[in-house]
A protein has these predicted regions:
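Intrinsic disorder/low-complexity segments
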Residues: 27-30, 48, 124, 128
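Bacterial N-terminal signal peptides
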Residues: 14-26
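Terminal beta-strand-rich extracellular "head" domains
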Residues: 101-139
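Short N-terminal leader segment in a subset of presequences, especially plant chloroplast
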Residues: 9-12, 118-120
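N-terminal secretory signal peptides that target proteins for export/translocation
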Residues: 1-10
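N-terminal small/polar-rich segments of proteins
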Residues: 30-109, 140-184
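Short stretches within intrinsically disordered, low-complexity N-terminal or propeptide regions
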Residues: 13, 70, 76, 92, ...
């Protein structure tokens, strides 16, 4: 019997502890609050770089330097860059030092001055530029794409120097424009 009383006493104490715990838990929980935040990101449009027009010197004479005019559509190189409107892009031109004939047996010197490049963040052509900015083709500034048209154009001119004994034929070289978002 004493043993039953001990168990009954322990059961009462256990029950009281359970009641106290159940009574305290709501008060402890009310001292906390929860807030939910979100992580967000917006992926910008992919940049697309297109060669609209090649740099074209036309027919040149042996020993006579020839320049392409940056304002003539048929002569000036025209690259378009499209992407997320208003986003800033870093631009880099990889320019050749020589044009090579089709058999790679003769080359012609080509050069670019610090004023042979223009950047215009508008829709247009070399002849209809809206607000061109003169730029050094070896050190192009970061430029924002047009906010609503999502575009900019890079125009390029240059000069070739045929030798007096330049081999007859067509000459060419690659001009590469690289564009990348700056995050600004």
């Amino acid at each position: 019997m004493i043993e039953n009383r001990k168990h009954l006493g322990l059961a009462k104490i256990g029950f009281l502890c359970l009641v106290v715990v159940i009574w305290i838990i709501p008060f402890a929980a009310s001292a906390q609050e929860v807030a939910v935040g979100q992580a967000t990101a917006t992926v910008q449009a992919v940049l697309a770089v297109t060669s609209v027009q090649d740099l074209n010197f036309g027919n040149v004479l042996q020993g006579v330097p020839s320049s392409a005019d940056i304002d003539v559509v048929a002569e000036a190189a025209d690259f378009s860059v499209t992407g997320s409107g208003g986003a800033e892009v870093a631009l880099y031109l990889q320019l050749p030092e020589y044009l090579w004939n089709s058999t790679n047996t003769d080359r012609m010197q080509i050069s670019f001055s610090s004023t042979d490049c223009e950047i215009d963040a508008n829709i247009g052509t070399a002849a209809t530029k809206v607000a061109p900015v003169v730029a050094d083709p070896y050190n192009l500034p970061a430029t924002a794409l047009h906010a609503t048209n999502n575009i900019l154009h890079v125009y390029l001119a240059g000069t070739v120097y045929p030798a007096v004994d330049q081999a007859v034929g067509a000459y060419s070289a690659d001009i590469v424009l690289t564009a990348a978002y700056t995050g600004n």
